[in-house]
Curated annotation (Swiss-Prot):
Residues 1-38, 52-73, 95-151 are annotated as: Disordered. Its main location: nucleus. Belongs to the TDRP family. GO terms for cellular component: cytoplasm; cytosol; nucleus. Interacts with PRM2. It is found in: Nucleus; Cytoplasm. It comes from Mus musculus. Keywords: Cytoplasm, Nucleus, Phosphoprotein. This is Testis development-related protein. The lineage of its organism: Eukaryota, Metazoa, Chordata, Craniata, Vertebrata.
Amino acid sequence: MWKLSRSRVLLDEPPEEEDVLRGAPPASAAAPASGASLRGWKEATSLFNKDDEEHLLETSRSPKSKGTNQRLREELKAEKKSGFWDALVLKQNAQPKKPDQIEGWEPPKLTAEDVVADHTEDDRSGCPPWSAWEDDTKGSTKYTSLANSASSSRWSLRSAGKLVSIRRQSKGHLTETCEEGE
């Protein structure tokens, strides 16, 4: 029976009970299985389009030379749009600029009235300006050394006097503003 042509076997199919008894696999059972797998493959491949396939194939191929590798990297960078996190990383890596290096920033311009007003406030407090302290620090850095006992005691007295004058001025400003508000 198997030696006959396949189309004839499918037409002259014996009942299933006889096939089970003979132990021979049914010829029709193989056909739906192969069709099902083909149908499943078509469904799986329909999920992906040709662009995806080409993209996957391009990334899996290894470049033949270093020049093409660099070109691929440049193309990927050009295609990639910068996102929020990329911009954040760039901002983090950028060195902070000094105020004089920032575009459009200019140091404040003091008028003669501002300078006179600063000197009159120092005169009101009764403390002389700290010119001696400034003279000590001109030769070195902007910090003063307190290792010398004479300079440390002088510094502490002057700073205490200056702090008291600042407190008095700030209290005066607070009381004046409170009275104006009432």
